[in-house]
Amino acid sequence: MEYSTFGKHIIVDLWGVDFSLLDDIHFLEYHLVNAADCSGAHVLNVSKKEFQPYGVTVLVLLSESHLSIHTYPEQNFAAIDCYTCGTTVEPKIAIDYIVNILKPERMHIKRLIRGIGEIVTTD
């Protein structure tokens, strides 16, 4: 079976997010897994790390690629990354879910199409 190299990649910077949300590893793990499920992705594994004195990284390994968040609670900042291979999963659904949960004051987003030759931005 031959697989397509086509993929969608969304990267997001969130600013003005509540400190307590960004420093709660269990809250973030729960919601990243739920976001992945809502997007149609298949979760294979979750890796997570708490940093001292603040900050969290959660990586959700997907059959279709990955969803991750890196937080800097003391700066009210989170970096989110969602890459999905193929056409069966919609990373925008996962990103929208997370943004709605974290309620940032502002965000910056880039949408990329990958695996078609050149990397193409779609925003």
Show the residue positions of the predicted features:
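Polybasic/polar functional segments that serve as interface/processing modules
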Residues: 1-123
